[in-house]
Amino acid sequence: MQLGNNIQTLRKKKGLSQEKLAEKINVTRQTISNWELGETAPNPEQLILLSKQFE
């Protein structure tokens, strides 16, 4: 769940909606929601894409 909380916190700090972040890394809004809720986790490639958005 910690990873999901971190994704949500960083996303909000960048002023991104779930939809906008999803578009930027080519996943669905539901995928972002699932990550933030800790239901699923990003794969290594997706983690790299996320890290680039949060630089």
State what each model feature region is.
Residues 15-34, 49:
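Short alpha-helical DNA-recognition segment
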Residues 45-55:
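DNA major-groove recognition helix of helix-turn-helix/homeodomain DNA-binding modules
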